[in-house]
Each structure stands twice: as C-alpha cells, then as structure tokens.
From Swiss-Prot:
Subcellular location(s) of the protein: Cytoplasm
An MF annotation (GO) of this entry: transaminase activity
Protein EC: 5.4.3.8
Name of the protein in its database record: Glutamate-1-semialdehyde 2,1-aminomutase
Entry cofactors: pyridoxal 5'-phosphate
GO biological process: protoporphyrinogen IX biosynthetic process
Taxonomic source organism: Mycobacterium avium (strain 104)
Short name of one Pfam family: Aminotran_3
Length: 445
C-alpha cells in the first residue's frame, strides 16, 4: 500500500491485535510488560508488532507503519540493520551466555570510554533501571551519605528511591510515585523542580552534608523533551563539587543517540558517574554505568560496594551494542539530525496550518510535540499543556500508517533509515492529524 493510500485509509484492521491483546491480558498484567505500551494515555488497542525492518513496522493485521518510536530510542540505525543482525547471529552461534568474562565486554567498555571523556571505568548491567540503581548505591557508598536529589519529571527507571514525581510511564498514568515504595525510602529522596538551580542551592543549604548525589537526565526526555537551561548542568556540577556530593548524569536515553558522545558531546559537563542504555545495547537488554576510576573502584570485587548480575555483559547483547556503535559514524549522526529537522518542520507546518498551538522542543535529534503556546521548561509546564489534543492526533497518524509515541509525555525518535517514502507518508498523514488535534474536545480528555 502506498503512502497516499494508507494516509486516507481510516479503517485500519485491528482484529488480530485485539485478539492478541485479549490473550495477553489473560496472562500478563494489563497485557503488556511495560505500562506505556497499553495505550492507556491514548485509548484503543495497541498494535501487536510482528516484524520490523529499516524504519517500518508490521503488525499482526498486516498494517505497516513508519516508526517514530524506534523502540523508545535504541534503533538509531533502523530495525534489523544487516551489520547488527550479522553480529548477533555470529555471537549467538558461539553460545548465549557463559557466566564468565568475554573479550567483547572489554571492547564495548573501551568503545564507550573513548566517546565520553570523564568515564574511566564501565560496569555492564542489564537495564537502565539497574544502571541508575547501582549508580545511586555507589554514590552512597563512596560518600557515606544517604540523601539523593532528583528532579520532577526526570525518570531514572523504576528504582524505588527515584520514582517520586517521575516522568515516563509514571507521568503517563498520572501517578505521584508508586505503592510499594516505603516512606523510609522516599524520605532520603529530595525532589526539586527541574531547571531551578536556586532550589538546588537551597537544598544544599539545608541538607548539604547529607546529600550523596544529585541525579539528573542529561537532557530530559521522559516528560517530553525538556532541555536543560543553558548552564544548568554545569551549575549542578559546581554545587555538587562544592558540597562533596557526586553528580550522576543519566544518559540512558541521550547516550550515543544525540551525538557520538551523547549529551556530553553537546554539553560537556564532567559528571562523576554516568548511566547508559538503549543505543549502547543495539536494542537488546543491556545497560551500563561508569565514571571516574576513583569512584568506580569502590565496586566489588575491588571495593566494598556490592553489585552483580548473572547476565551482565551478555555476549549477544554486547555484540549488538558494539555493532551499533561501530556503525554510528559521523554520517549516521548527520542523518539523524537531518531527519529530526525534517520531521520537526513537517509537524510544525501542519499544526500551524491547522491553527493548533504547539511547541516542538529539541534535544539534538530527539523531539516532542507539546500542545501549547508557552515554552515548556519543567514538569509543571509540561503537565499544563493541552494533552487532551494528543489522543486524536495520535490515532489519526496511526490510522494513516505512522507510529508516533503513545503518550504526550514521551519523546519522538528518528533513525537513519527514514527515507523519502517514509517522509512522504508522514507528510500525507499530518494534515488530517493536525485537524483532529484542532477539533479535539477538552471535555473528552
């Protein structure tokens, strides 16, 4: 089906996905293994994806979509990139897991260290949540302090201490935190408004000798894209250093996506610890945390801070990550930036023509669509946007063969695989989607 055909085909087949969703709900809570996938924020039945190649997804009903989610960020080269598939197949043929060191683990760590100057040592783990959890534990062990400062709307995985006022699925579902997080755990977390350096100064004035670390997304993408104000991350570095606390920069989303060196390549602030995921795993379950040697060498077996994982450094995931990073060259990052520019222009033109108030903030090649005339600078202003316009906008795009993020608080991601046919489909779909947003009824939100 051509782009113009599917852009006007509003009777998208869904029977197979609906049946699969019912089956999933019978055995998996909510039918999904990560809450945002359930389409809670936009309604309807999530398509069940059966295949992907390049920038295109195929669902169980045979519908095809231009992918603007990219598995929530990792797929910078597109799906089933030949070099990544070949590397994974070769690694899998040699064995899936050994519970022992492998040469490729050190190669991946060295590749990451070469890209982010302050990182001198890397520890591989299995998820971004595990990376931030371990970084927080290490910061507490290194400083001998308990309190952690985080920011409203920043999401660092489902770590108990960091779920308070978080972004991503917590924002999508409208949850302030999560049942099961104890008061004692929450008491050691100080939550501050994002981009408010005066609030950080006040926190250090009150609790400075108790604060182990400040953790921040390098450039937040879990309340939508809300870049740091100029100098904000540098000011965090200065304040933490002044008070003997560590700075943890979460680059799980931005790392090796927005530049060869992640957000560090755009805003080079020398944090004590960084967390990574998504791109560095090539789409398989792997993540990492790293930083200066003095801190990292407090980890077991060299030091007393314990961290371990049966599948950490999994050879198949490491192979996918290495292949992705080695093919993410200057041309790839130029293509990502150009594709993000092109997508942002199409979005803005369509929404402007339909008279829809909007902001399209950027963090390198990451972007978001906020329905508002007012710049979004923190979680409060993100939540104040006209989110009720998003579900009809989303579904109009989905019905026309374009797959955007299924929440107003999530990031839009591009890949190098986006081609002219994909952009033609997006361009054909956007006018009707913009009109749907313009005609949205706040009372139905």
């Amino acid at each position: 089906m051509g782009s113009s055909d599917q852009a006007t085909a509003h009777a998208r087949a869904q029977a197979a996905s609906a049946r699969l969703f019912d089956d999933a709900c019978a055995v998996i809570p909510g039918g999904v293994n990560s809450p945002v996938r359930a389409f809670t924020a936009v309604g309807g039945t999530p398509p069940f994806i059966t295949a992907a190649r390049g920038c295109r997804l195929t669902d169980a009903d045979g519908n095809h979509y231009v992918d603007l989610v990219c598995s929530w960020g990792p797929m910078i080269l597109g799906h089933a990139h030949p070099a990544v598939v070949e590397a994974v197949a070769k690694a899998a043929a040699s064995g899936l897991s050994f519970g022992a060191p492998t040469p490729a683990e050190s190669e991946l760590a060295a590749e990451m260290i070469a890209r982010v100057a302050p990182v001198e040592r890397i520890r591989l783990v299995n998820s971004g949540t595990e990376a931030t959890m371990s970084a927080v534990r290490l910061a507490r062990g290194f400083t001998g302090r308990a309190k952690i400062v985080k920011f409203s709307g920043c999401y660092h995985g489902h770590v108990d201490a960091l779920l308070a006022d978080a972004g991503s699925g917590v924002a999508t579902l409208g949850l302030p935190s999560s049942p099961g997080v104890t008061g004692a755990t929450a008491a050691d977390t100080i939550v501050l408004p994002y981009n408010d350096i005066d609030a950080v100064r006040q926190a250090f004035a009150e609790f400075g000798d108790q604060i182990a670390a400040v953790i921040t997304e390098a450039s937040p993408g879990n309340m939508g894209v809300v870049p740091p104000a100029p100098g904000f991350n540098a000011a965090l570095r200065a304040l933490t250093a002044e008070h003997g606390a560590l700075l943890i920069v979460d680059e799980v989303m931005t790392g090796f996506r927005v530049s060869r060196s992640g957000w560090y390549g755009i805003d080079p602030v020398d944090a004590d610890l960084f967390t990574f995921g998504k791109v560095m795993s090539g789409g398989l379950p792997a993540a990492a945390f790293g930083g200066r040697a003095e801190v990292m060498e407090r980890l077991a077996p060299l030091g007393p801070v314990y961290q371990a994982g049966t599948l950490s450094g999994n050879p198949v995931a490491v192979a996918a990550g290495l292949a992705t990073l080695r093919h993410a060259d200057a041309a790839a990052y130029a293509a990502l930036d150009a594709n993000a520019d092109r997508l942002a222009r199409l979005l803005s033109d369509a929404l402007t023509n339909a008279g829809v108030p909007h902001q399209i903030p950027r963090a390198g090649n990451m972007l978001s669509v906020f329905f508002t005339d007012t710049p979004v600078t923190d979680f409060a202003s993100a939540r104040a946007t006209q989110t009720w316009r998003y579900p009809p906008f989303f579904h109009a795009l989905l019905d026309a063969g374009v797959y955007p993020p299924c929440s107003a608080f999530e990031t839009w991601f591009v890949s190098t695989a986006l081609d002219d046919d994909a952009f033609d489909r997006i361009a054909a779909a956007l006018p009707a989607a913009a009109r749907a947003a313009a005609g949205a009824d706040e009372g139905n939100s």
